[in-house]
Curated annotation (Swiss-Prot):
Its main location: cytoplasm. Residues 22-49 have a biased composition (Low complexity). It comes from Clavibacter sepedonicus. Residues 21-71 are annotated as: Disordered. One of its GO terms (cellular component) is cytoplasm. Homodimer. Interacts with FtsZ. This is Cell division protein SepF. Belongs to the SepF family. Pfam families: SepF.
Length: 164
């Protein structure tokens, strides 16, 4: 058992350990044993994998990209005082209601944060966000068309609001 490869194989269980003292005591004829047939293992029958029913974690969106132009029944005006009021904006906009957001009662940091949220909301639901005045914005769903011109003073107000 001086061979290091053999020692490694014995250690890993890939070979049987043969003792040197037994080999020297047995005659050469007794060392050879008759060949015995090894039974082949029978593979177990494969069972069909049982799949559990899948429960969706999120309910599907009710807003479709190409919503049919419907008669506009309402426009929601929101005067948020804190960022937590964004939920009201999101729920109504998701249902296809245009939302006017008046940020005059919010701090500049919270207003900027709310506008970032509203921008992501409008992009995610294929709508648009437009500035009406210095701190008033309009979120319009994809089926609502808004027309108008942007004057030079509105461009200046936009630059001053975002600190450009």
């Amino acid at each position: 058992m001086a061979n290091p490869l053999r020692k490694t194989m014995v250690y890993l269980g890939l070979a049987d350990e043969e003792l040197d003292y037994q080999q020297g005591q047995q005659p050469a004829q007794q060392q050879q044993s008759p060949v015995q047939a090894v039974p082949t293992p029978v593979p177990a029958p494969q069972q069909q994998a049982k799949r559990a029913p899948v429960t969706p974690l999120h309910k599907p969106s009710t807003t479709t990209r190409n919503a049919a132009p419907a008669e506009m029944n309402e426009i929601l005006t929101v005067h948020p005082k804190a960022y937590k009021d964004a939920q009201v904006i999101a729920e109504n906009f998701r249902e296809g209601v245009p939302v006017i957001i008046n940020l005059s009662q919010m701090t500049d940091d919270d207003a900027r944060r709310l506008i970032d949220f509203a921008s992501g909301l409008s992009i995610g639901l294929y709508g648009k966000i437009e500035r009406v005045t210095a701190k008033v914005f309009l979120l319009s769903p994809s089926h609502v068309a808004v027309s108008g011109e942007q004057s030079a003073t509105e461009a200046e107000v936009e630059a001053s609001f975002f600190g450009r």
